[in-house]
Swiss-Prot record:
Its cofactor is Mg(2+). The gene is gdS-2. It catalyses: 2 isopentenyl diphosphate + (2E,6E,10E)-geranylgeranyl diphosphate = all-trans-hexaprenyl diphosphate + 2 diphosphate. PANTHER family: GERANYLGERANYL PYROPHOSPHATE SYNTHASE, SHORT CHAIN ISOPRENYL DIPHOSPHATE SYNTHASE. This is Hexaprenyl pyrophosphate synthase. It holds the Pfam family polyprenyl_synt. Binds 2 Mg(2+) ions per subunit. Mg(2+) 2 binds at residues 81, 85. Belongs to the FPP/GGPP synthase family. Highly thermostable, remains fully active after 2 hours at 80 degrees Celsius. Its EC number is 2.5.1.82. Optimum pH is 6. One of its GO terms (biological process) is isoprenoid biosynthetic process. Changing residue 124 to A: Generates the same C30 product as the wild-type.
């Protein structure tokens, strides 16, 4: 099965898990807001968790708790980001705060986030919970650096984006019971997250006016101004793809998945580029 086929099947499964999660909480007064926040989405992060779980020899059903929790955390973080950034659209529709207002969205995300962490603890234990809390803290630090510190672009995107990718991949070590691969799987997520975000920031320069650029992409302006944006982005992509390739050679993945594992950086990058009608870097 190709990674695209796996993603399509995993996405359908994650959508079903989210629907079941919402149906089990029909007593919420704010269930409609939760449904709105969690709807749609590419489900890349949850898919990575499911994919690496089976690649490590685990049962895909053991990844369901992690995949669900990751997508809840990701969607909640986006809803909060939209409030902070005053972004009026999300996933092709109005942002949740535009529809429901800031207060309700903040209240419901404050419920969703600990609920997701509880799912992780219930599914994989206290060590997985502690790891998840530390990564969620890193996400918050990354958001602060994104807004107020332009000193280290790579560190910013590792924290801002890489942390949830790291959560996606490290939970596969727990789900597959390959606990000895925990640090390696954290690094897998780190490298994929950096690759994903640098391409995403590059796309911003190709699809927006310069004055509309915000977030971590603003830290790339000096390369844009000097006419070196493509060169820099390509160098980051190749550097972290090489690190990723070297790393996965030392992880006990099942051989039948190795080809698709190696293709993941290209899959993530090309997905972002093609969505923006960009052929290549």
């Amino acid at each position: 099965m190709s990674i695209i086929e796996f993603w399509l099947e995993a996405k359908a499964t994650i959508d079903r898990l989210i629907e079941q999660f919402l149906n089990s909480n029909r007593d919420w007064d704010l269930v409609d807001i939760s449904s709105y926040i969690l709807k749609d989405g590419k489900r890349f992060r949850g898919t990575l968790n499911m994919f690496f779980t089976v690649a490590l020899g685990g049962d895909i059903k053991d990844s369901y708790g992690g995949a669900l929790a990751i997508e809840i955390l990701h969607s909640a973080s986006l809803a909060l980001d939209d409030i902070v950034d005053l972004d009026a659209t999300r996933r092709g529709d109005k942002a949740a705060w535009v529809v429901y207002g800031n207060r309700k969205v903040i209240f419901i995300t404050n419920y969703l986030i600990p609920t997701a962490l509880r799912i992780i603890q219930t599914s994989y234990g206290d060590d997985a919970l502690n790891t998840s809390i530390e990564l969620w803290k890193d996400t918050s630090v990354g958001a602060l650096r994104d807004m107020y510190d332009n000193s280290d672009y790579i560190r910013t995107i590792e924290l801002k984006t890489g942390s949830l990718f790291k959560l996606s991949t490290v939970l596969s070590a727990y789900a597959s019971k390959h606990y000895n691969t925990k640090q390696q799987m954290l690094d897998v997520g780190k490298y994929l997250g950096i690759i994903y975000q640098v391409i995403d920031d590059f796309v911003d320069y190709k699809t927006k006016k310069v004055e509309e650029i915000d977030g971590s992409a603003k830290q790339l302006f000096k390369y844009y101004r000097e006419g070196k944006l493509e060169e820099y982005v390509r160098s980051v992509y190749l550097e972290y793809k090489q690190k990723y390739d070297e790393l996965i050679s030392n992880i006990p993945f099942q051989s039948k998945y190795l080809s698709e594992i190696r293709s993941l950086p290209e899959f993530l990058a090309n997905g972002l580029l093609k969505e923006a009608n960009i052929d290549k870097i």
